[in-house]
Design a protein with these regions (language model features):
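A short, glycine/Asx- and small/polar-enriched loop/turn
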Residues: 2, 100-104, 155-162, 273-275
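Rossmann-like flavin
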Residues: 2-103
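Helical element adjacent to the flavin cofactor pocket in flavoenzyme catalytic cores
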Residues: 68, 78, 110-170, 175
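A glycine-rich dinucleotide-binding beta-alpha-beta segment and adjacent secondary-structure elements
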Residues: 83-97, 254-258, 313-358
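Residues forming anionic-ligand binding surfaces in small-molecule and nucleic-acid pockets
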Residues: 104-115, 272-274, 282-283
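Mid-domain catalytic core of redox enzymes
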Residues: 152-271
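C-terminal segments that line or cap access tunnels to active or ligand-binding sites in enzymes
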Residues: 221-330
Length: 358
């Protein structure tokens, strides 16, 4: 199949666009400039600061209208690029935060410029190394950490959270509670005796949730040195697949995949002569009628076959270990509402000030 090497800077990207569709070079340069303007408003003046007041967001509305932020990401990209596969490649950013490019506001096209501005980094040792470093930092400052405990509910007195109830029956009193739990789950399951404000109840009733994720982790007894750290494998269908995931909520015979090969950057992720991967497949969340106990292994086999036909030849014979997670695991392990991979979807009416407040 065709390939597109995204590159690490605009010059590399332009070179690839020129190879595939020379007529789209000028359009891409306009897209990049528009993405920068969206970044200056959508990130610098909106996302990078707290939303304590609706007026703060309201002040940016005229500029957002001038930038045509009412368009979807797909409409934004299609206005600049004509080649269908380039349109697909440059409209996938909303999927990085759980959104459908055909529904998500083009504000999120700022991600393209953001990646060039800040870069894309990987911590040696992976996310686990970041967690270990944070644990060490907190312990050095006298913070007591409790591992393997699950908070079942918050204890509220006079409108304030004053403690937490654990699943093992213990109670911990607190002067202040900071929670990074999935907000919809917290409001619906961890405040059993609290009547929520009307606005919060309305948000919950009308909330649209992000897609689910099927994540397959596997190791191989050989290396695939030609495979980069990040690879996206696009299926034959695009809009139809996304419609099945986000609206029809059914599994499609086609799949699009994100393949992560950390050993391309950090060889400690696998023994010598071996490789380590995970592959992420967008799927419907648990609002769908899907039995993941039955469908999980089928999808795993489909993904392995797809990778074997494309970027990892001979994969079926080289896998030495593997396991997968489904939206059901996200619900059970991470208390994510409907097993959504990214909580509520990044629609305009659920972004910035419209999100759940602190």
């Amino acid at each position: 199949g065709e390939h597109f090497d995204y590159g690490g800077n605009p010059e590399d990207t332009v070179s690839e666009i020129r190879r595939i569709s020379p007529d789209d070079v000028a359009g891409y340069q306009r897209l990049l400039e528009h993405s920068k303007r969206l970044f200056d408003i959508g990130f610098t003046k909106l996302s990078a600061r707290p939303f304590d007041s609706f007026l703060l967001m309201l002040k940016q509305v005229p500029t957002l209208l001038r930038l045509k932020a009412y368009r979807t990401v797909w409409q934004f990209v299609s206005a600049h690029l004509k080649h269908d596969k380039l349109r697909r490649a440059f409209s996938i950013q909303p999927l990085l935060v759980g959104g459908n490019p055909f529904d998500t506001t083009s504000i999120y096209s700022l991600i393209h410029f953001l990646e060039y501005s800040f870069g894309v980094f990987f911590a040696k040792g992976g996310t686990g190394a970041i967690v270990d470093a944070l644990v060490g930092l907190m312990e050095r400052h006298g913070v007591r950490l409790m591992m393997g405990q699950t908070v079942s509910s918050l204890h509220i007195e006079n409108g304030a959270a004053v403690g937490v109830h654990l699943e093992d029956g213990n109670y911990i009193k607190a002067d202040m509670i900071v929670s990074n739990a999935d907000a919809p789950y917290l409001f619906t399951s961890m405040l059993p005796d609290v009547k929520l404000p009307l606005m919060t109840r309305a948000k919950l009733a009308q909330a649209h949730y992000s897609m689910g994720l099927f994540v397959l982790y596997f190791g191989t007894k050989r290396t695939y040195d030609e495979v980069a750290h990040h690879t996206i494998i696009m299926g034959e269908s695009y809009q139809e697949l996304l419609t099945d995931i986000f609206h029809r909520k059914v599994l499609n015979d086609d799949v699009s995949l994100y393949l992560h090969r950390p050993t391309a950057t950090d060889t400690s992720f696998a023994p010598p002569g071996c490789d380590s991967f995970y592959v992420l497949c967008p799927v419907p969340n648990l609002k769908a009628d899907i039995d993941w106990q039955q469908e999980g292994e089928k999808l795993q086999n489909q993904i392995i076959a797809t990778l074997g036909r494309t970027v990892l030849p001979g994969l079926e014979e080289t896998i030495v270990s593997n396991f997968f997670m489904t939206p059901a695991d996200f619900k059970d392990d991470y208390r994510s509402m409907f097993g959504a991979g990214f909580s509520i979807a990044p629609l305009f009416r659920q972004s910035a000030w419209f999100r759940f407040h602190n």
